[in-house]
Amino acid sequence: DRPCHSYTGRMFARIQSDIQCILERDPAARSRWDVVFSYPGFHAVVLHRMAHSCWSSGWTWLARWISHWGRFLTGIEIHPGAKIGERVFIDHGMGVVIGETAEVGDGCTIYHGVTLGGTSLYKGAKRHPTLGKGVVVGAGAKVLGGFEVGDGAKIGSNAVVIKPVPA
């Protein structure tokens, strides 16, 4: 077993899973090729996974560079330190911002214009929200602060959330 081969296998399995989740959740998705070539939310998540891997390995400059290009190409800004679960779907993602200490659980759906932002400037502190599994965040919502949004919660479009949300 070569470590790189193992990592590459896991990476492609996650990509397959991400594609499948989009096909299941978006009636406009016609095929795998459609998702791979024309879904900026998918591109942003794949680029984030690369950036996060670099960030976690101490290659912060490379992580920031990948993140910067991801934002330029997709209009979606995900800090390389953010943790993104599996089968996360960013739909119509233009303007999405996900901060450094944010965590997005498995199976979440995030629509355009969403901010998972911080409310403090303290380095090393948990400044951004944690979304549980299966959370849906509607277009334009702002979720601000280092608190938890429970599994399966639904946050309405244009909501401003500054306190924990129960499951």
Task: Pin down the residues of each PLM region.
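Terminal amphipathic alpha-helical/low-complexity segments used for targeting or macromolecular assembly
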Residues: 1-74
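Glycine-rich phosphate/ribose-binding loops and adjacent secondary-structure elements
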Residues: 123
